[in-house]
Amino acid sequence: MKNQSNLAESTVIAPEVVSKKTNFFTKFKTSYGPGILAVLTWLGAGDLVTSSVAGADYGYSLMWILALSLILRFLIVNVIARFQLCNTEGLTILEGYGRIHPFFGYFMFGYALIMGHLFNAYMIKGAGEVLSTLFQVNQPFLASLVVVGLVFMLIGRNIYNRIESVMKVLLALLTIAFLFLAIQATPDVGQIIKGTVGFSIPSDTGVHGALLVAISIIGAVAGSISNFVHPYFMKEKGWTKPSHVKVQRNDLLFAIGVCIVINLAIWVVGAEILKPNGIHVETIDDLAMALQMSLGKFGWYIFYLGVFGVLFASVVGKSTGFPRLIVDAFYVINKNRREKYNGKYEKDPMFKWVMIFVLVTPLIWSIPGMPGFIALTIGVNAINIIGFPVIAIGMLVLSNKKSLMGKYKNNWFENIILTLASVLAIWSAVQLATTFF
């Protein structure tokens, strides 16, 4: 509102000039907000690690998994967002799930609580390791404590506008750094295309098994419960009506486009720089080697500052987004509590306690002797796939309810894709179970 007021005052002086400025700046600002937040909530260590490990260990042979996962992410998040904007009763996505069967409310509450803890576990661990390396103190656990303390200082202080601006800068820096390195590496386009349409799982040749890496990519990209955080950022932006469907879709396309560029650049770095040099990504320092080999100490700083920025921003995003998701799921179970606080999470003491849980308890994974950052990241994103079948099947049912969606219910193409997503989810979960048990 403040921006609109300022522009209105300026119009009196130079209407033609301001009109052009308003069209450009206002359109950009209002079109690309939640998508930026979504990218950083999605991105973080999951994409960074899975793409680099896949590239360094298996070249481009698993590229088709990434392509499929990004397509599924767009379609799933678009359906989730459309439900939030267009359902006839003004339900949140989790309230919609609760309408299908009470099981969904209990499942989503427990699943979101566990995954909120686990996602922040490797994000905080990674941010602590990077901060420790930057300051050369060799105390990653203490650095993780500092990260959590800094996040506490940010939360609740006009957080959306501040974080959005910071995230745009960090995302741009990270993208430019990896994109520059990927272009410099002169990627083999033929191999990229071959890997994108290959549809095969290579034999295990890396530190981490090919099937585990593939499932981890699906979990990190397509099957992430972080996809459910997007509607809460939309609400903060003021996108709450069917009239916002188009701008939401454009915003989401922009977000997915950024994801494609970043993931592809990271993958190319792994395949063209790390793999030929026999470097397997077992620690975050192994990934830093790519920039250091090409850009020297400057590249080293760019990598660690950029990665710290993304990890830190992701911790903030998850620590504010997941509590909304968790409390919303609990409101599906306990409708009286929703009515008591009029559906306003921030007024509910539970929201604060859940935020503390999601932010503080993951520190146990940063204690010396716990699994390494890379292994933890791959493991958590693989485990994330367990909830994907429930999410995909529930979404397929919910988005076809004409009583709720009217003319905005799924078209035939979306139904085919969601059905395939459900099949992929069940296959991935079964494969993961047989791998471990």
Descriptions of predicted regions:
Residues A38, I65-G98, F107-M115, F119, ...:
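Juxtamembrane transmembrane-helix boundary signature
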Residues F74-C86, M234-K235, G257-D286:
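Extracellular/periplasmic helix-exit of transmembrane alpha-helices
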Residues F109, L134-G156, A172-L179, K344-I364, ...:
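Transmembrane alpha-helical segments of multi-pass small-molecule transport proteins
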Residues V146, L154-P187, N381-F388, N410-N415, ...:
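Membrane-interface loop-to-helix entry segments
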